[in-house]
Structures are given as structure tokens and as C-alpha cells.
Amino acid sequence: MKYDDLIQELNTWEYDEKIYREYYFMKKTPEKVKDFVKSHSDHELEVGWVLNPELLHQNAGEDEFISEKYNVSLVKHPRYLPVFYHEHDFFEIIYVLSGTCTNSFRDSTEKLTAGDLCLLAPNVRHGILAVEDDSIILNILIRRSTFMDIFYNTVRDKTQISGFFVGNLYSREKIRYLLFHTKDDIVIRNYILDMYREQKTSDSFSDRIICSILTLFFVELTRRHGKK
């Protein structure tokens, strides 16, 4: 698939997104909520999440979100899903392909716009909210061991990114996240779309190819946007 086709596919509305959007804009009167639940009775899970977002995973392990045969997983964050605070034991990249989102922490909130990229350390409590129709937010979930392998093999210069690696692997005072404003950097965008496309291929070679692309991604991110 071409890049434009991948973006068009990602922009397609999933049914759960339609449910979340409807609830976001509707008046929350008891009657309206009752009608809402009834009209989506065949999607109890999604309705439960939108009514009680605290039911979503608050503490997640790698194997809950990353398939056993993969080291990396790319997931589109649903538009209009109510914000829920959670943490997990793997690394995460939040990339804004288009539109905007907010990423909230215990003591601060970052507003991300198209091209922004947030590199998030494990066990950092946060919540994401994307409430614009044109928002496409990709979450890249990376096993801790995979992240370490990439660091040892590629990211060795004294840059902001290498400091993030070292701090989270060895230091008591960890860097919670790094924020990059890549703006309209097509190189960075295309590496992410390449990983997404390969995940769709899903054959016996896909995991190795995705990990290789991820390695190139981090090297290019360091070269093009890493602060020394």
C-alpha cells in the first residue's frame, strides 16, 4: 500500500470511535444515556468503557498489548475515547500523524499537534485524549528488552535520546518522557507508516523487519531531532 492509502485507512472510522464520538457530544441526561446504551446493546464492552473509563487497564504488562510473537506493536488510539490514566511496563511512542491530542501526567499536560512525537518511559502514569475528527494518533509499543537492544547496538552518541535510554536503564532518577516536534518531517513519518504497513503484512519475517525499521527510525530521529 502507498503512504496515502495507509493514511486513508487509518482515518477510517471504526465502530468504537463512532460510539465514543456520539457519547462525547450528546447531552448526558439519564434518558439520553439510557437510549445510548440501548442503541448500542451489541457493543457492551465499548459502551462500558465510555461510561466507566476506569474499567480500562490501569496497569498493563507487555503481553497484554504486544503479541507473543512480536517485539513491537502499533495501535491507533481511538478518537473520542474518554481519557483514562494508566501505566505499563514497556516503552511507548505516541505519534500524531494528523490533528491533535493531549497527553496528561500527574502534574502536567502536553498538547501534541501533527508531527509531534512523545517517547514515554515504562511505569509513567498518563492519559491520552484525542477529540478532533481529523486526529490520527499512533501508539508504538516496544518491549523493554527490544528497547535495550536498540540502544546497545545503535544509539551511542551523547544526545538527548541516549540520555533517555541510559537514565531509564540505570539511573534512579528516570526521565519520564521526551517530546519531539518533527513537524512535517516526512522521513520520520514514513518510518512509522512503514512499520504499520509491515505489521499488516504479518508473516514470519514481519517482526524482524519492524525491529529493523525501528532501529533506523531511532537513528534518524537522533540525527534529525536529537539535542546534544
Regions found by a protein language model. Name each.
Residues 21, 79, 106, 125, ...:
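Arginine residue identity/basic-tract feature
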Residues 67-162, 207:
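N-terminal regulatory/effector-sensing and dimerization cores
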Residues 2-10, 58-64, 68-69, 131-197:
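A hydrophobic/aromatic-rich effector-binding and dimerization subdomain
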Residues 1-100:
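Generic protein-terminus/edge-of-domain signal
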Residues 120, 163-164, 170-171, 212-222:
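Short amphipathic alpha-helical patches
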Residues 2-5, 109, 143, 222, ...:
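General structural signal for secondary-structure boundaries
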Residues 179-228:
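An amphipathic alpha-helical interaction segment
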